[in-house]
Design a protein with these regions (language model features):
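Conserved nucleotide-sugar donor-binding
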Residues: 151-166
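A conserved acidic beta->alpha catalytic loop
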Residues: 35-45, 63-65
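Conserved donor NDP-sugar-binding/catalytic core segment of glycosyltransferases
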Residues: 91, 106-141
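Non-catalytic, C-terminal membrane-associated alpha-helical segments of glycosyltransferases
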Residues: 211-301
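Short aromatic/hydrophobic "clamp" motif used to bind/position activated sugar donors
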Residues: 98
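Short, acidic, metal-binding catalytic loop of nucleotide-sugar glycosyltransferases
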Residues: 19-28
Length: 301
């Protein structure tokens, strides 16, 4: 199992992430930390940890001139750093799985053991991951998502699936594109509640909450999401802090991308596949909401 962790200014979290990986009941064969142009002590701490953890390797990326440092999400620098880590490894044919782990995510001690067991139990499983816990009001609480969506912060691909989809693309929305391509190739994508990880930075907050929601809306335009689906989705987003403004920012990002004709994913059959899935999920949500006592099960994510 190969794990790659793009890290930008994660000096506060990297040691905890490393200790959690070293304590895994099934640790990775190789963990590549990509110091992505950090301006804090991330590189120095990573180098020290690599002397202690035998499966850890550190690589650094050159400075990027094409990005506002406050808007790394827009140009998918995380995906770019991941691919540079992959290139540094070279031949990955000996690995059964390839994973991405963010530099602010601490895994439970048996996290990989549980996820790998799911792969062993289902040969059709292509992408898997656990649930993220975030600290809200002093308590670690799960941040639910659709069962078929795996958060980009802790994805694990089977080697066969990763090869079939051609790895990950370096553009906004990469962590939705890979899942759709996997399902188009006949693989399942699943998140599993029993496997938990603590996320020390709220999802979408690294570039500022509202900017993150704008980029989220733009990403969903790129991914080929339909207008009705996006409108329904915005109602859920609006419940995220800052309430109301988050939903408006999300819709603005989608509408602006549409107005600017931001290029969408242009793969034969891709958009039709996406919108067919969305119609199915919306129909299921409507049916669930119509059942007495089942309104809570109607979720559009």
């Amino acid at each position: 199992m190969l794990i790659i962790s793009p890290m930008h200014n994660e000096a506060e979290h990297i040691e905890g992430v490393a200790r959690a990986l070293a304590a895994q009941t099934r640790p990775p064969s190789l963990w590549v930390v990509v110091n992505d142009n950090s301006t804090d002590a991330t590189g120095e701490i990573a180098a020290r940890l690599a002397e202690e953890i035998d499966f850890m390797k550190v690589v650094s990326t050159p400075a990027s001139s094409d990005v506002d440092s406050a808007d790394r999400l827009a140009v998918a620098l995380e995906a770019r750093a991941f691919n540079r880590g992959l290139a540094a490894v070279g031949d990955i044919s000996d690995f059964t799985h390839v994973g991405k782990l963010d530099g602010d995510v601490e895994l439970g001690p048996d996290y990989f053991e549980q996820i790998l067991a799911e792969f062993d139990a289902d040969p059709e499983l292509g992408i898997a991951g656990g649930w993220i816990l975030e600290c809200k009001g002093g308590e670690w609480r799960p941040t639910p998502s659709a069962p078929e969506h795996v958060r980009g912060a802790l994805k694990l691909w089977s080697a066969e699936c990763f090869a079939a989809i051609g790895g990950i693309v370096e553009r906004l929305g990469w962590d939705g594109i890979d899942e759709t391509l996997a399902r188009m190739h006949g693989y399942k994508t699943r998140s599993f509640r029993a496997a938990e990880a603590r996320h020390f930075r709220e999802t979408g907050s690294a570039d500022g909450r509202l900017r993150g929601h704008v980029r989220w809306g733009e990403a969903h335009w790129i991914l080929g999401h339909g207008v009705l689906w996006t409108a329904a989705r915005s109602a859920k987003v609006a419940r995220i802090r800052p309430r109301g403004a988050s939903g408006a920012a999300y819709l603005y990002g989608y509408a602006r991308a549409a107005a600017l004709r931001v290029p969408r994913v242009e793969i034969d059959g891709y958009r039709k596949f996406v919108q067919t899935e969305q119609r199915r999920r919306m129909s299921s949500a409507i049916r669930a909401a119509a059942r007495p006592g089942r309104a809570d099960s109607a979720r559009v994510v």
